[in-house]
């Protein structure tokens, strides 16, 4: 017998050795408003078919959890692949990236044509049939050579390259009916779990819609992101030109000794984009009918806002402009007036953390050519101070505001739109592990943050992981709603950044204790990083955006 401690109930029960989690879950009585999809066993994510042979702590998870959503979405991608293969046997499907609160998938039929509305409807109907049939996702361990042979025969060369460079002896594959596929993490037990989904024709492919994270019985509301898709398409085009569509391609190139070239290309592409932005700002600044005086820069945590802002300042100077940095931090309300969260802690991400009325008053004066004494925030006392710091804009001056709320219209509502230039910085990862395993868009930002926080002595890896859900909630509420308002989106994703981050992050993630809740995420990230051939950071230049996270930068 094995003794199971259920964290959901705080109680123990005994079961026969080898009992699967699928049979254990119903024996514990707790509120289950939604179907159980996964579990954490000793703080490691496991599928419900996992069999328990030793005493363990178990926490059962539904769709409202990050792990539950990942299991569901991954399984849904396999369901889509199976339906597409059933209807269009010679087609090629690629799960490109999360977008518009779903997943964009490209599908190329054997005649080279794109999907039609009718095709998508038929695929959706076939997916429904497969759900109704409740077919199990069968898990099997294969020797790496056996798996490579299977995927060579099916023409999945992207998987072949990934498996040839991952260094594993055995891997876990899944089959759904007559289709075998590889996923880098677990799936739900069967298709019957996947009741809520939608498919929609999107840019010649499919937008796979997933449930709402708070109300899994409903689809997540559709949120169009045309500018984000445009940036993704541009980055994907460059990757295609270089022959680097997935991690296997990148690993193969690194193993051939091309890491230095990949670093230089990544740097050149980012600098080219910064130059283009600077030149557009100069053009707008010189336009008497559209005179840009204020540049607003924002983006989610660890997107590289500060470094991009500094590099943009250099290029603006090269254009003959005089950039002046203007920090919203200096306009924080006094700490005693800071909004609070329900638990009583300070909500530093709240829009009202900034005294936006006072900030706008100074902005209007500055943009009208007046001299203004600006405050400086004392983070020790938690109060604004005036220390004789005066600002005045000259004829060639441009004011740069970089901050969490920079694109929130309320922050600069008294400034005419024609005087603003809005930049949104994000990490839009365009390579995938393989054609059916896209990389979560927030993983590189989380890894950047973990490494930076640790190297600067600000937080341990455990603390950074623990705080990440709060960071993400703030981004969803305060930052992403204004992404499509930007004049330009800058993609700060770096072609070999996971390979570089691996050399720093592995030892840092290894410090997370196994007996804490954050271990499950540390374990997942370590497993994920193992797919990348490591690259030394010695050739990353001091001005690189990555240096802001791994250290050794000149800014």
Predicted regions and their residues:
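Conserved NTP phosphate-binding and transfer environment spanning the P-loop NTPase/kinase superfamily
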Residues: 285, 409, 413-555
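Hydrophobic anchor at the beta1->P-loop junction of P-loop NTPases
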Residues: 295-297
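Conserved lysine of the Walker
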Residues: 305
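Glycine-rich phosphate-binding loop used to anchor ATP phosphates in small-molecule kinases
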Residues: 360-417, 468-482
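Auxiliary tRNA-acceptor-end handling modules of aminoacyl-tRNA synthetases
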Residues: 50-69, 83, 92-100, 104-272, ...
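Short beta-strand-centered segment that lines the nucleotide-binding/catalytic pocket of NTP-utilizing
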Residues: 318-336
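Hydrophobic positions on the alpha1 helix immediately C-terminal to the Walker A/P-loop
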Residues: 308, 312
């Amino acid at each position: 017998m094995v003794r199971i401690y259920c964290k959901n109930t705080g109680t123990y029960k005994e079961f026969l050795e080898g009992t699967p989690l699928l049979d254990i879950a119903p024996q514990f009585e707790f509120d289950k408003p939604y179907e159980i999809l996964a579990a954490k066993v000793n703080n490691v994510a496991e599928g419900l078919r996992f069999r328990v042979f030793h005493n363990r702590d178990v926490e059962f998870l539904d769709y409202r959890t990050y792990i539950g959503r990942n299991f569901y979405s991954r399984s849904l991608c396999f369901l889509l692949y199976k339906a597409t293969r059933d209807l269009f046997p010679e087609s090629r499907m690629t799960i490109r990236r999360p977008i518009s609160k779903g997943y964009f998938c490209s599908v190329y039929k054997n005649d080279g044509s794109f999907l039609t509305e009718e095709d998508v409807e038929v695929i959706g109907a076939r997916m429904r049939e497969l759900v109704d049939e409740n077919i199990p996702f069968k898990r099997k361990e294969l020797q790496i050579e056996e798996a490579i042979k299977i995927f060579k025969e099916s023409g999945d060369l992207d998987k072949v390259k990934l498996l040839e460079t991952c260094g594993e002896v055995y891997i876990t594959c899944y089959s759904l009916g007559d289709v075998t596929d590889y996923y880098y993490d677990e799936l739900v037990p069967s298709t019957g779990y996947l009741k809520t989904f939608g498919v929609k024709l999107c840019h010649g492919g499919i937008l796979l819609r997933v449930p709402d994270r708070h109300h899994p019985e409903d689809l997540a509301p559709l949120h169009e992101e045309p500018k984000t898709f445009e940036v993704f398409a541009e980055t994907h085009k460059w990757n295609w030109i270089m022959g680097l569509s997935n991690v296997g391609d990148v690993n193969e190139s690194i193993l051939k000794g091309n890491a230095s070239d990949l670093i230089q290309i990544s740097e050149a592409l980012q600098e080219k984009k910064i130059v283009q932005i600077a030149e557009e700002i100069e053009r707008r600044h010189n336009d008497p009918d559209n005179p840009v005086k204020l540049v607003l820069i924002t983006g989610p945590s660890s997107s590289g806002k500060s470094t991009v802002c500094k590099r943009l300042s250099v290029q603006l100077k090269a254009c003959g402009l005089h950039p002046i940095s203007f920090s919203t931090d200096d306009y924080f309300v006094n700490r005693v007036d800071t909004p609070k969260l329900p638990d009583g802690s300070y909500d530093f991400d709240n829009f009202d953390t900034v005294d936006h009325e006072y900030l706008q008053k100074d902005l209007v004066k500055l943009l009208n050519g007046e001299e203004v004494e600006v405050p400086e925030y004392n983070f020790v006392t938690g109060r604004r101070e005036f220390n004789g710091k005066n600002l005045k804009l000259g004829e060639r001056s441009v004011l740069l505001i970089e901050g969490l709320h920079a694109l929130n219209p309320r922050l600069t509502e008294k400034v005419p739109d024609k005087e603003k230039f809005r930049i949104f910085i994000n990490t839009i990862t365009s390579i995938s592990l393989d054609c059916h395993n896209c990389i979560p868009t927030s993983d590189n930002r989380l890894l950047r943050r973990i490494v930076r926080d640790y190297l600067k002595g600000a937080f341990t890896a455990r603390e950074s992981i623990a705080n990440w859900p709060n960071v993400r909630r703030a981004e969803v509420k305060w930052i992403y709603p204004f992404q499509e308002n930007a004049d330009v989106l800058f993609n700060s994703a770096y072609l070999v950044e996971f390979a570089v981050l691996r050399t720093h992050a592995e030892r840092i993630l290894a410090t997370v204790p196994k007996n804490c809740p954050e271990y499950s995420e540390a374990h997942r990230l370590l497993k994920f990083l193992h797919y990348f051939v490591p690259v030394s950071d010695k050739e990353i230049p001091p001005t690189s955006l990555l240096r802001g996270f791994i250290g050794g930068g000149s800014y």
